Amino acid sequence: PEALRAAITPRTKLLILPYPNNPTGAIMNRDELQAIANVIRETNIMVLSDEIYNSLTYGPDRHVCFAEIEGMKERTIVVDGFSKSYAMTGWRLGWAMGPKEIMRHICKIHQFGIMSAPTTAQFAGIEAIRTGDDDIARMRDQYDLRRRFLLGELRSMGLDCFEPEGAFYIFPSIESTGLTSEEFCERLLHEQEVAVIPGSAFGASGEGHVRISYSYSMNHLREACSRMRKFLENLKQEQK
């Protein structure tokens, strides 16, 4: 809360909260959200809460919508979509919820700037809502297995790794290799044909890390980890 309070200036109009988080997989529990809300109440700031990974959490703390926090419903715009929960990436179908006056302006911009989502995507979204909840549960269980597998593998390689509790990404530190995140990714791709994302793509604070997605099959993840382990072993030999 103190860091947030210190970052707010008279020019601050909006706080963006993306959680569960991409790239770290971090979530926010009710106490943490309440602490943020306490700071927001001291200001006139609105909150844009990006909760597109809300169905994909794995620890004891389940997702809490920021608008549920007392006094925040009138100050919050929630954005969500079908891409992650229903595995509909590419359909580009989502929604927003917020105070009536703000939504009126959002609808105007959307109506005359974007028109509407394709009809086929809308029908697919309707069917997902009607019949897809069991699939979400099965998918979440599979993601959890992959998450725990990947966390164990990366740590066994000697990489420091924050345990993700949401989304489907893991964000290990690669500082011990002596490479920048871009160098690491380029070499891993060219030498072992494994693609990961440099942490620098997410800003200066992401440097020294790489983002790995576990939205692939266990067979793909096992093979990727085997190749990544070989890459790190070769790198150690090279640096001796």
Predicted regions: what they are:
Residues P1-K240:
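PLP-dependent class I/II
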